[in-house]
Amino acid sequence: MSEEHVHLDESEVYHIRKQKLAELRTSGFNFPNTFRREHLADALLKQYSETEKQTLEQKHVKVSVAGRIVLRRIMGKASFFHIQDVSGRIQVYLRSNDLPDVYEQFKHWDLGDIVGVQGELFKTNTGELTINAEHVELLTKSLRPLPDKFHGLADQELKYRKRYVDLIANEDSRKTFLIRSHLIKAFREFMDDNHFLEVETPMMHPIPGGALARPFVTHHNTLDMTMYLRIAPELYLKRLVVGGFERVYEINRNFRNEGISTRHNPEFTMLEFYQAYADYNDLMNFTEQLFHYLCDKVLATRQIEYQGQVIDFNKPFERLSVKEAILKYHPDIKAQQLETVEGCRTLLNDLDLPYKETDGLGKLQIILFEETVEHQLFQPTFITEYPTEISPLARRSDTNPEVTDRFEFFIAGREIANGFSELNDAEDQAERFRKQVEEKDAGDLEAMHFDSDYIEALEYGLPPTAGEGIGIDRLVMLFTNSQSIRDVILFPHLRQ
């Protein structure tokens, strides 16, 4: 029975294919692993698509390919079928006269089955590059049907839960994750070329730190101690700078026990790096160079279309302080209103934006910025002068101790990177940790713990240093024009 021409539900197809597999086992089929592929579909198409039909026949090009059957047309004593490998698709021509036994078996194979094919290249009368099969071998029997070839896997939730099916059915999904891989490779190339050392730091921490976030908690049975999945590698990377590794980076996962949205996944990938004898201005310049390199290397263009608008990486990236950004996008607000707690509270009340009575001036300014300005920063923009009270690891500004030498980098209305000149004064850092502990005791679940070992490391001396973290998932969203972070994570977190 050919299921392509009969409307069957998935359970019926599964039952029929199980029967086919049982019959195959009886005849000796055991999922063989002796076939060796020598060619990829895309490479063959690139090499021979422009070759004239007659010239190709004279060359007698022998090939060996393997992949999944994704399309087939059975026509009496001859059939065409397409196989799909990691690179693309190629057509195969199979004749009963050439391989009578295999042809009879082929008629009972199904879409989704994985086969190995050896044969000679030729072109059909319509000019399509095709393999004239001389050997065809079933390698894997597929028991479940592929999604409808015209509609693919349309259910978004199902795409995320069954990514393996999504990758089979949707070329766009495969392209997204290829771009992701190329992007991470380009990150590494740029960092290595700039003399940064790639390192690995712990994923389980005895004390959570490095960011303001709620951690995932676990327990180490042998040591009988509470451990935390890391929310950031920052404090360990800076320990390495203390130890003498002056340029370090890490690409790895962070975990934050927070909400899930189109921009947030509890498990996400970051590039984090630290450079001794540099400040946050150096890192902003470095970031511009990095993004130029990524655009050139991965997309071969510095203008990217995202959700119907063009992001231009060619122009110098705009730089605004938090206050300047608020005033730019709220021309009705007066600068002096941002200088007092009462003025900021009035602005937030007028906009019906919530805040805590204990929030200081800097926190109130940030609420106003995040809720009303951030989403408008579409072109690449650095926002600087973040308040000290929300930047416990950043160095204070020499000209205004109420703000820090810190920036956040925004594209398409979302934060892509966060960087600052590092606080290397052990006594100042200890005092800020103490204030964080007070906030935690007052109910702030995201406030930091006091990390005495990190303070001790600073007491040995951290050179003037700047550090930055870049969210790779969000950047992949931009580079692939994806609306949701789930579209760029192979196996995103979902409700059970």
Curated annotation (Swiss-Prot):
The protein's required cofactors: Mg(2+)
Family per record: Belongs to the class-II aminoacyl-tRNA synthetase family.
GO biological process, one term: lysyl-tRNA aminoacylation
Cofactor remark: Binds 3 Mg(2+) ions per subunit.
Extent of the signal sequence: none
Name of the encoding gene: lysS
Taxon lineage: Bacteria, Pseudomonadati, Pseudomonadota, Gammaproteobacteria, Legionellales
Positions with a binding annotation for Mg(2+) 2: E415
Matches recorded under HAMAP family: Lys_tRNA_synth_class2
Protein name: Lysine--tRNA ligase
UniProt-recorded Gene Ontology molecular function terms: ATP binding; lysine-tRNA ligase activity; magnesium ion binding; tRNA binding
Disulfide bonds: none
Keywords: Aminoacyl-tRNA synthetase, ATP-binding, Cytoplasm, Ligase, Magnesium, Metal-binding, Nucleotide-binding, Protein biosynthesis
Sequence positions that bind Mg(2+) 1: E408, E415
Organism encoding this protein: Legionella pneumophila (strain Lens)
Catalytic reaction list: tRNA(Lys) + L-lysine + ATP = L-lysyl-tRNA(Lys) + AMP + diphosphate
